[in-house]
Amino acid sequence: AWVNSGVTNIQGRYSTGMKSSQMQTGENAIMITFAQRILPWISFGANFKILRHDLPITESDQLTGSGIGFDIGVLIKTGQFNTLGIMVQDISSNYQWDTGDVYAEGRLYKDEFPTIYRIGSRTNIKGLIVVGDIGLITNHDTFASVLPRLGVEYGFLDQYYFRGGYGNGRTAFGLGYEYGLFKAHDSHIDYAFSMDWTAQTAHTISYAFSF
């Protein structure tokens, strides 16, 4: 999967205060996911992430930070319609910056992501899937905060899906469409609209192929 987020139409200015060109900044993540069922009631999964962050410095120069990260998780089936999940997110995730080419006294440094420990559960109530989890955010050595999340999904004709949820300070609504490309139900297209408390909005489109 590829995830992109950024801001465009940033008004650049010269040192005198006069306007220069329009600039933009962006973050990109490419994620490769693997999962394996070990026993009928337990599965293991992992994400490998390639990260990149571009910051505008001048009209023609940008400062780029890049790095890698990992997520691991275990999924346990606790009943016919219930599952329990445990996950560790952003293991060793970081941006590494080199400002030597931008500033005469620049240096190499690393921005490390907080590591998040999550535990959650899912249940199916007459076709309505309810998912919730709670995350413990740590600054590697110390506890920082608690992050709760809740989501619901309703399937129609085993092909169309309607979703809603709250998490990370954002409320979201979405749609999903499942179809067969090479075999039945092997492809998924999903769209989500989200908004935070400051009324900042985001649109996310994703595609998944199962094999």
Placement of each model-derived feature along the sequence:
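Outer-membrane beta-barrel porins/channels
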Residues: A1-F211
